[in-house]
Amino acid sequence: MEPITLHHSYLTWVFPAFLLIFGLVAFLRAFYPKHFADYERLLVNNKYIAIYGKKERKLHLFTVVLYLMQCVCLALLIYVGMKHFGIKKLFSERFMFLELTLMVIAILMLKLVIQQWVSSLFDLSDFCNDYIFIRIAYSSYAAIGAVLVLFIGVYSSLVSVTLLAVLFSILLIINALSWVEIIKNNLKEIKPYIFYFILYLCALEIAPYVFLIYGARLVITHQ
């Protein structure tokens, strides 16, 4: 339960990471004010999902920046957690945050590719596009919210196991809301096929991680 001591080496990457995240938020707010205003109220109403989920069948810069922000936020959360528990051997000390960021981006991009591949196998392209849009919206919102809490914790010297548990809870709860939104949006269609719908969700959400873990094991065993 001891708080982290804010050594210079610890803050070397934390400050630029916060600066980048808040800079991306400012960019979205300045260049997409209507978009951003609707996104801010994501947990209050589903206006953002209802309007932009249909409009943005193709990649939109707002969604791309959100996704990038999510990657940086998650990397920062992992970085702080690893520093707190003294985990240093997996990455070089000097470039630990950069390596984590690249790893998170690679994993999430691979996950997207695998989800698209799984959706094409089951002929679920339309559903998968809606699914991915909602998941990105909520998971990015969760990551940004967790980083805002982390910002207060880091610069108040309050980073502890309790705070890390709170951050994990924020990620878990808001991501769970995305599943509620997906089910609500497809309730009429899934009622007669609830079992198959659960299988589809498992295929889209769990299958990518199975492939990633299997691939990682192959790489490790061949080294």
Q: Which residues does each predicted region cover?
A:
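Juxtamembrane boundary at the C-terminal end of a transmembrane helix
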Residues: Y209-Q223
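Hydrophobic, aromatic-rich alpha-helical transmembrane segments
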Residues: H7, L11, F15, L19, ...
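Alpha-helical transmembrane segments and their membrane-interface exit regions
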Residues: L24-V25, V44-I49, L171-W179
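Selected alpha-helical membrane-embedding segments in polytopic membrane proteins
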Residues: Y32-D123
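Membrane-interface helix termini and inter-helical loops of multi-pass transporters
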Residues: E2-I4, G81-E93, L158-S160, H222
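Hydrophobic alpha-helical membrane-embedded segments
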Residues: L6-D38, L110
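Hydrophobic alpha-helical transmembrane segments and adjacent short intramembrane/lumenal linkers
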Residues: C128-V210
